[in-house]
From Swiss-Prot:
It is a multi-pass membrane protein. In thylakoid membranes, TATC and TATB form a large receptor complex, containing about eight TATC-TATB pairs, which binds the precursor protein. Twin arginine signal peptide promotes pH-triggered docking of TATA oligomers to TATC-TATB receptor complex, inducing a conformational switch of TATA that results in activation of the translocase. TATA dissociates from TATC-TATB upon completion of translocation. Keywords: Chloroplast, Membrane, Plastid, Protein transport, Thylakoid, Transit peptide, Translocation, Transmembrane, Transmembrane helix, Transport. One of its GO terms (biological process) is intracellular protein transmembrane transport. One of its GO terms (cellular component) is chloroplast thylakoid membrane. The keyword Lyase does not apply. This is Sec-independent protein translocase protein TATC, chloroplastic. Residues 165-195, 244-273, 327-330 are lumenal.
Length: 356
């Protein structure tokens, strides 16, 4: 047995007698462990009490457990890790997925429009993405079929439509020429296409509404009817205004300006390019009140903000008239800028009536 083993097998008195100095380690270890035991004892005391209470409650039955109520717990210096692992204190209630933020009633109308509450949505059948794509394909097919049928019907009466659209300037002595072979044929195709699209637009609008309306809330469905009706009326009103006021004024300006200098012999294709673009651009520009009403309902712009920028609106109306009209004369631009400004002010008034 080695020296280490010999030391372990001898008593302290024997080792001391042999001249080996031995230090009493056990009392020293006890003294060193006294502070550690004294610190750990308070931490273990609540746990012992809790176990004793649980044992008493188990013996007395469920009634004693209910009567005892919550068990008292004392905090201890060594319970920091356990406290960190416990559940956090309850925070403010979460409403409508806002994570403690403002409720849905306090949020903007745009947020409500993008993320409506389930209570506002009607109880319609849910569809997958493939069902939506299939429905979209069917509605596009119906729209194309309706527009194609309208174009064929207009092509059957294309000559009558050409004579009807030539009426604003025929009284001024203007004659139309066919400058290339087939020019009149392609002109009739163009006129038939524009008129067929105009006649088929109600069906296109209906298919769009039928596709979109299942995803709208009840309030949005009530609001959709006036928007669609107002948009359709304003579009056809713009076309009527262009045919009766804007186009004759612009064409008469050109005829009178060239009177005495040149004879007015116009290309049939260039004339219908001018008249058709002017009519449809005027119809689209008459949608300004509809856009204002939509922005007001979404809460993006108020009526006071619309009226406060009237100076910029005047400049914008003139610029828009210059872009929308195919001619460069100032008379046509002013004739279109005036109604645009009036429509803008009317739209701001409508937004104010609705409480925005």
């Amino acid at each position: 047995m080695g020296s280490a083993g010999a030391l372990l097998w001898h008593t302290p008195q024997q080792l001391h007698g042999r001249g080996i100095l031995f230090r009493q380690s056990r009392p020293l270890l006890r003294q060193r462990n006294l502070p550690l035991i004294s610190l750990a004892a308070p931490a273990l005391e609540p746990e012992r009490r809790r176990r004793q209470c649980l044992r008493c409650a188990a013996v007395d039955g469920d009634g004693a457990l209910r009567e005892s109520g919550p068990l008292p717990q004392k905090e201890s210096p060594s319970s920091g890790i356990g406290a960190a692992l416990e559940d956090p204190p309850p925070g403010p209630p979460v409403e409508n997925g806002s994570f403690g933020g403002p409720s849905q009633e306090e949020q903007s109308a745009l947020y409500t429009f993008l993320y409506p509450s389930k209570d506002l949505l009607p109880d319609d059948k849910e569809m997958s993405i493939f069902d939506h794509l299939e429905e979209l394909r069917d509605r596009i097919f119906i729209s194309v079929l309706a527009v194609g049928a309208a174009i064929l019907g207009c092509f059957a009466f294309s000559k009558d439509l050409v004579i009807f659209l030539e009426a604003p300037v025929t009284a001024q002595g203007v004659r139309f020429l066919q400058l290339s072979p087939g020019e009149f044929f392609f002109t009739t195709l163009k006129v038939s296409g524009y008129c067929g699209l105009l006649l088929g637009s109600p069906i296109i609008l209906y298919e769009i509404i039928a596709f979109v309306i299942p995803g709208l809330t009840r309030d949005e469905r009530k609001f959709l009817g006036p928007i669609v009706l107002g948009s359709s009326v304003l579009f056809y009103l713009g076309i009527f205004f262009s045919y009766t006021v804007l186009s004759p004024a612009a064409l008469n300006f050109f005829v009178n300006y060239a009177d005495g200098a040149v004879e007015s012999l116009w290309s049939i294709d260039q004339y219908f390019e001018f008249i058709l673009v002017l009519m449809f651009s005027t119809g689209l520009s008459f949608q300004v009140p509809v856009i204002q009403l939509l922005l007001g309902q979404l809460g993006l712009v108020s009526s006071d903000q619309m009226l406060s920028i009237w100076r910029y609106v005047v400049v914008g109306a003139v610029v828009a008239a210059a872009v929308l009209t195919p001619s460069t004369d100032p008379l046509t631009q002013m004739l279109l800028a005036g109604p645009l400004l009036g429509l803008y002010l009317g739209g701001a008034w409508m937004v104010k009536i609705t409480g925005r």
